[in-house]
């Protein structure tokens, strides 16, 4: 486990550095263009590193189903009716052993271009995370790049059985796939599947709907879902063995971590088996679980051997509600307590490819209003924090790109470019020349905050002390709209205060004597609270009354270093 605080930059290479700005709804790669591995130049990567990031999660690296025709390069043509969007979903994998040809300057050199990206990322002082999608594959999965000693998924399946411990897929016996509920031109439907396979979201019917993950099929890990969830893990299921080979393949490419898509839809026993086997050969490699079931958290850490878990249904949901005014900020204490013993294993974020942008009309409508939430999420513990590319510039996600409608999210299904990223790119200069003052301001905030997360040892490795209980009855605090806590270690003590109110506030924060004892700090008569983010606040003097009077902007916050004269 890293001694530094892990700070992840999630980026969809298809969008990053895209040189075309046509942005035609449902446009092709010819019309709208695509980002490339090579667009992550040393200059671009050094700028990402300067913002404080330790890891880059390159989203959508592994080859996935797409409507773009690469048959001239020996890549099988896909069926449009089983693909979401023109570019396709990065989570409908068509070949686990290949990379997305959209991302290559020269398609025939696509793997080498990815390997060079890994090398460049490492040379710029950052680690590489990619997706591992274990639960499902594209309906028309066909690997052309697999090693010769690896058999194809489903090649040895007995398709007359809806379930068999030795099968890679689940089947709907004697039924043909029926796409009539999917919104496509059914006169042009050419894809056929008999017997039909179960769809990726545990849909065991031959007739998936438009609300199902109809572009994917579920993989069989030895669980008979339609027979009381009976498990068949001995002998080791063939799917397990295939997946171990895939993980080793990418680990050998010097990838430093895997973000495991929908990890809880795969049996815990598989993770318990495979992660230690991978870590035996690659002990520093990270495994991050996309997981939404709080009751499973500890098992996925203690048995499943994951390093980190998504904190979506905990901190993200609560902080979002607080920022939007739907619940009091005091609720943050309760959600932190729920994962108190494992909080250092939770991955915090305010945006990712699944969630709505802070600046969208569906969230806060203004990136500045996300500052309080970001300070809290980044500084509340030693655990990782993640930022989604464009978040640091105030990307709104309010385009109607094609398959992805105007929903406050940046598309993962369509060819597109992001104006703010394109202007930061500035023809490969990766500077602020073309950014607006507002974009520069929010970017500078993220840069300052994320760098502080590792510059200040109290944030990087220190302990946490919640100040809310000491301020519930404080009439000058307002525990429904403010949140305050301490972070400290043997070197320093930090006071962090955030304001979720829509107005600037003068806040009186009580720090009890017990807090100083908790951090083994000697409290003296005269103290100073020096702002590190410097949002208008001068250094504040305080005495042994335990109270600090602080001025906090609307939807903002500050980190104060506490010292004594």
Predicted ranges, named:
Residues 1-127, 135-137, 142-146, 150-160, ...:
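N-terminal structural segment of carbohydrate-active enzymes
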Residues 2-8, 12, 92-93, 98-119, ...:
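Alpha-amylase-like alpha-glycosidases and glucanotransferases acting on alpha-linked glucans and related
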Residues 3, 19, 66, 81-82, ...:
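Loop/helix patches that line or flank the sugar-binding groove of alpha-linked glycan CAZymes
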Residues 13-15, 62, 100-103, 134-136, ...:
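Short, flexible loop/turn elements at secondary-structure junctions
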Residues 17-20, 64-70, 136-143, 266-270, ...:
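Short catalytic/ligand-binding loop motif for oxyanion handling, primarily in non-cytosolic enzymes
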Residues 39, 43, 113-116, 242-245, ...:
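Extracytoplasmic/secreted proteins, especially bacterial periplasmic and envelope-associated proteins
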Residues 55-60, 128-132, 259-260, 387-390:
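Short beta-strand segments at enzyme active-site cores
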Residues 501-565:
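C-terminal beta-sandwich/jelly-roll accessory domains of carbohydrate-active enzymes
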């Amino acid at each position: 486990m890293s001694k530094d605080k892990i700070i992840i930059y999630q980026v969809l290479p298809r969008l990053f550095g895209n040189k075309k700005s046509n942005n035609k709804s449902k446009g092709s790669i010819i019309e709208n263009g695509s980002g490339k591995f090579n667009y992550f130049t040393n200059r671009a990567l050094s700028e990402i590193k300067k913002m404080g990031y330790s890891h880059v999660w390159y989203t959508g690296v592994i080859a996935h189903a797409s409507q773009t025709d690469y048959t001239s390069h020996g890549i099988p043509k896909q069926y449009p009716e089983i693909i979401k969007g023109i570019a396709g979903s990065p989570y409908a994998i068509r070949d686990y052993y290949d990379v997305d040809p959209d991302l290559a300057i020269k398609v025939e050199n696509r793997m080498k271009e990815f390997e060079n990206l890994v090398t460049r990322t490492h040379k710029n002082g950052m680690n590489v995370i990619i997706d591992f999608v274990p639960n499902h594959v594209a309906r028309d999965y066909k690997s052309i790049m697999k090693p010769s000693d690896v058999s194809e998924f489903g090649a040895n399946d007995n398709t007359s059985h809806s379930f068999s411990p030795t099968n890679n897929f689940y089947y709907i016996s004697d039924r043909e796939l029926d796409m009539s509920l999917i919104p496509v031109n059914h006169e042009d439907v050419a894809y056929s599947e008999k017997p039909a396979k179960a769809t990726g979201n545990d849909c065991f019917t031959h007739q998936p709907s438009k609300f199902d993950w109809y572009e994917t099929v579920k993989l069989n890990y030895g669980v008979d879902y339609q027979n009381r969830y009976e498990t068949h893990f001995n002998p080791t299921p063939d799917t397990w063995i295939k997946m171990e080979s895939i993980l080793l393949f990418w680990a050998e490419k010097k990838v430093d971590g895997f973000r495991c898509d929908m990890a809880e839809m795969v049996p815990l026993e598989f993770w318990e088996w495979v992660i230690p086997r991978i870590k035996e050969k690659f002990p520093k490699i990270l495994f991050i679980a996309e997981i939404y079931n709080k009751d499973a958290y500890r098992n996925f850490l203690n048995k499943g051997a994951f390093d980190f878990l998504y904190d979506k249904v905990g901190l993200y949901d609560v902080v979002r509600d607080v920022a939007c005014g739907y619940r009091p900020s005091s609720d943050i204490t309760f959600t932190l307590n729920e994962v108190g013993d494992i909080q250092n294993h939770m991955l915090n974020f305010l945006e990712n490819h699944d969630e709505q942008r802070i600046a969208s009309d569906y969230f806060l409508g203004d990136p500045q209003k996300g500052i309080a939430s970001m300070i809290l999420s980044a500084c509340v513990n030693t655990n990782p924090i993640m930022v989604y590319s464009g978040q640091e510039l105030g990307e709104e996600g309010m385009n109607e790109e094609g398959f992805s409608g105007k929903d406050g999210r940046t598309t993962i299904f369509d060819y597109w470019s992001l104006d703010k990223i394109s202007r930061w790119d500035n023809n490969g200069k990766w500077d602020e020349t073309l950014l607006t003052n507002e974009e520069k301001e929010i970017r500078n905030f993220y840069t300052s905050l994320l760098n502080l997360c590792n510059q200040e040892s109290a944030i990087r490795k220190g302990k946490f002390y919640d100040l809310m209980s000491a301020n519930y009855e404080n009439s000058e605090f307002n525990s429904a709209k403010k949140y305050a806590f301490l972070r400290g270690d043997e070197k320093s003590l930090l006071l962090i205060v955030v304001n979720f109110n829509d107005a600037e506030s003068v806040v009186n924060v009580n720090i009890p004597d017990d807090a100083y004892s908790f951090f083994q700090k000697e409290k003296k008569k005269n103290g100073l609270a020096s702002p590190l983010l410097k949002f208008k606040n001068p250094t504040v003097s305080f005495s042994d009354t335990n109270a600090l009077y602080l001025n906090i902007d609307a939807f903002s916050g500050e980190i104060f270093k506490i010292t004594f004269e």
